[in-house]
Swiss-Prot record:
Listed Pfam families: Zip
Additional free-text comment from the UniProt record: Zinc uptake is highly pH-dependent and no uptake is seen at pH levels below 5.0. Inhibited by copper and cadmium ions.
Source organism (scientific name): Arabidopsis thaliana
Molecular functions (GO terms): metal ion transmembrane transporter activity
Coiled coil regions in record: none
Taxon lineage: Eukaryota, Viridiplantae, Streptophyta, Embryophyta, Tracheophyta
Name of the featured protein: Zinc transporter 2
Top-level taxon: Eukaryota
Length: 353
């Protein structure tokens, strides 16, 4: 019974992913979706830009509002789901690697190419601004992670120092052994969640998750066509669902008292972060148009590329989800296949871009 229940949950989740993929392909393949806007807004060559898109289009803004709703509820429900049932470890392991491949391909094939093309349209061909901004986005994201890790490590040392004089030697050994087992679960930020015991420390690390998510949401808000918005939604929501599930599992281990209430609070914070980023992106588009809008879009896409590459490589692919129990698929070859399938899927979808 338990096995069939797990299989049913995994099957339903896979069907959801297939539905999202189908919606994404329709968004790219339909000539009436984003192409109509692009065709009706083709600029004269004298403007110095390759395309001029109506970023204030009601239909485009409406699609982004749909993205906000879908992002929030998918992330929030995924975050609280571990409280009600246990997820399949193999599914989370391979799903995280798959989303890492999607993220990596999105950064390099979509964001970086769009930023570079826009800079070329702005007559800036001598210097590789797009690649420089991608490197800057990578470094900024790494700096944020380093800052959070530094604060969390210092707080963790304080907790350990305070407990040494109050615990017996046998208790210390038991705590260390239990810690080793618990640290094996969750995505890397969730691992840090498990190492902390204070409300402030946990809130800080949730803030780190939200920091990444806001920048990811900005990528949706800055989309200049409806097809771009749907594609970015699919890419980001896929990653956030797995991250939210891992976060929920870590919180249940971390908070033995009132776990449901705090899990709901943290899941809400994590779920609302990307919609906030979408709103910021919509606001940027509403205040910039023409050459100024092109500059804003190119710079933002360049930085977003760096953020996505960092999240894909350091959070999803290299560390990923660590099963709490021995898992048959926890092998490099299966992880490679999952990442490769993610890259291949996004590469095929981009044919219709």
């Amino acid at each position: 019974m338990a096995l069939s229940s797990k299989t049913l949950k995994s099957t339903l989740f896979f069907l959801s992913i297939i539905f999202l993929c189908f919606s994404l392909i329709l968004a790219h393949g339909g000539i009436d979706d984003g192409d109509e806007e692009e065709e009706t807004n083709q600029p004269p060559p004298a403007t110095g830009t390759t395309t001029v898109v109506n970023l204030r289009s009601k239909s485009l803004v409406l699609v982004k509002i749909y993205c906000i709703i879908i992002l929030f509820f998918s992330t929030f429900l995924a975050g609280v789901s571990p409280y009600f049932y246990r997820w399949n470890e193999s599914f989370l392991l391979l799903g995280t690697q798959f989303s890492g491949g999607i993220f990596l391909a999105t950064a390099l094939i979509h964001f970086l190419s769009d930023a570079n093309e826009t800079f070329r349209g702005l007559k800036h061909k001598e210097y590789p601004y797009a690649f420089m901004l991608a490197a800057a986005g990578y470094c900024l994201t790494m700096l944020a992670d380093v800052a959070v890790a530094f604060v969390a490590a210092g707080s963790n040392n304080n907790h350990v120092g305070a407990s040494v004089g109050e615990s017996r030697e046998d208790d210390d050994v038991a705590v260390k052994e239990e810690g080793r087992r618990e640290i094996k679960s969750g995505v890397d930020v969730s691992q840090a969640l498990i190492r902390t015991s204070g409300f402030g420390d946990t809130a800080l690390l949730i803030f780190a998750l939200c920091f990444h998510s806001i920048f990811e949401g900005i990528a949706i808000g800055l989309s200049d066509t409806k097809s771009d918005a749907w594609r970015n939604l699919w890419t980001i929501s896929l990653h956030k669902v797995f991250a939210a599930v891992a976060m929920g599992i870590a919180l249940l281990k971390l908070i033995p008292k009132r776990p449901f209430f705090l899990t709901v609070v943290y899941s809400f914070a994590f779920g609302i972060s990307s919609p906030i980023g979408v709103g910021i992106g919509i606001g940027i588009n509403a205040t910039s148009q023409g050459a100024g809008g092109d500059w804003t879009y190119a710079i933002s896409m360049g930085l977003a590329c760096g953020v996505f590459v960092y999240v894909a490589v350091n959070h999803l692919i290299s560390k990923g989800y660590k099963p709490r129990e021995e898992c048959y698929f926890d092998k490099p070859i299966y992880k490679f296949i999952a990442v490769f399938l993610g890259v291949a899927l996004l590469s095929v979808v981009m044919i219709w871009d």
